[in-house]
């Protein structure tokens, strides 16, 4: 049987991957399932099931069957502000499956905020102090990974916005007017562009439109495909483009 130290080291390996591989909450849940020997569910603050791993199937399990758990379930989880150990039939009295299981609920916190919930379930055997130590350590690791995931998302959003702003900055006045009218005409993330129609509307040459599109395509903001006489199919690859163009209207 693995000792508490050996189990803690297994959980710690998750941290060793931080920054090297994308966050995989299913893998994290699987490791916690193995060391704690329980069903494990990792949920976001809004009740989205980020990852889970099943040791034993107990039937109609709301945590495993839903991408987002019902709001009333999540509200109950969020009201748990410190580890709730070995709950049986109190937290989810109305749920026939969960009320028959032994549940341990561990809040996931980070940066002073509630980030989510780590939920564990068993059929008969209660969670020991060692199990709770591993669960709380696991919740800390989950919190760090959620924070990292959020930071990566923020950085990616900032990078995409910067690329769009730089590309817009390279446009001449005529090219900028062409871009504004192109995406006003598309009215979405993709569609068919008839360059001559835009040229006549704005009072510019087709070459101005072509140059503007080339700049955006080389920046990886859009992709275009000629359909001959029908026009050009445009697809937005960077969703920050539409946001930045919308700001210009204000």
Swiss-Prot record:
Keyword Transmembrane helix: no
Gene Ontology CC: one annotated term: cytoplasm
Family the UniProt entry places it in: Belongs to the CodY family.
InterPro entries from the UniProt entry: CodY, GAF-like_dom_sf, GTP_trans_reg_CodY_C, Transc_reg_CodY_N, WH-like_DNA-bd_sf, WH_DNA-bd_sf
Chief subcellular location: cytoplasm
Protein name: Global transcriptional regulator CodY
Matches recorded under Gene3D superfamilies: 3.30.450.40, Winged helix-like DNA-binding domain superfamily/Winged helix DNA-binding domain
GO biological process: one example: negative regulation of DNA-templated transcription
Organism encoding this protein: Thermoanaerobacter pseudethanolicus (strain ATCC 33223 / 39E) (Clostridium thermohydrosulfuricum)
Subcellular location: Cytoplasm
GO MF assignments: DNA binding; DNA-binding transcription factor activity; GTP binding
Region annotated GAF domain, chain positions: 1-147
Keyword flag Nucleus: no
DNA-binding stretch(es), residue numbering of this chain: 195-214
Gene: codY
SUPFAM superfamilies in alphabetical order: Winged helix' DNA-binding domain
Biological role: DNA-binding global transcriptional regulator which is involved in the adaptive response to starvation and acts by directly or indirectly controlling the expression of numerous genes in response to nutrient availability. During rapid exponential growth, CodY is highly active and represses genes whose products allow adaptation to nutrient depletion.
Keywords annotated in UniProt: Cytoplasm, DNA-binding, Repressor, Transcription, Transcription regulation
């Amino acid at each position: 049987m693995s000792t508490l130290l050996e189990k803690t080291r297994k959980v710690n390996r998750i941290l060793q991957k931080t920054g090297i591989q994308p966050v995989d909450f299913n893998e994290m849940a699987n490791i916690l399932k193995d060391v704690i020997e329980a069903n494990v569910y990792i949920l976001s603050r809004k009740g989205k099931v980020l990852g889970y791993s099943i040791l034993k199937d107990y039937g109609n399990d709301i945590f495993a069957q839903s991408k987002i758990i019902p709001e009333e379930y999540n509200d109950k989880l969020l009201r748990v502000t410190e580890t709730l150990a070995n709950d049986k039939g109190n937290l989810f009295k109305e749920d026939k499956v969960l009320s028959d299981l032994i549940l341990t609920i561990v809040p996931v916190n980070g940066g002073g905020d509630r980030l989510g919930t780590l939920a564990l379930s068993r059929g008969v055997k209660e969670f020991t102090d060692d199990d709770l130590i591993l669960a709380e350590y696991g919740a800390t690791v989950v919190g760090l990974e959620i924070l990292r995931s959020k930071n990566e998302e923020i950085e990616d959003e900032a990078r995409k916005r910067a690329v769009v702003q730089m590309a817009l900055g390279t446009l001449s006045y005529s090219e900028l007017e062409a871009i504004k009218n192109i995406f006003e005409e598309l009215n979405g993330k993709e569609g068919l562009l008839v360059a001559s129609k835009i040229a006549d509307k704005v009072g510019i040459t087709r070459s101005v439109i072509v140059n503007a599109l080339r700049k955006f395509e080389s920046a990886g903001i859009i992709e275009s495909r000629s359909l001959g006489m029908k026009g050009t199919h445009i697809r937005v690859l960077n969703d920050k483009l539409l946001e930045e163009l919308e700001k210009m209207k204000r």
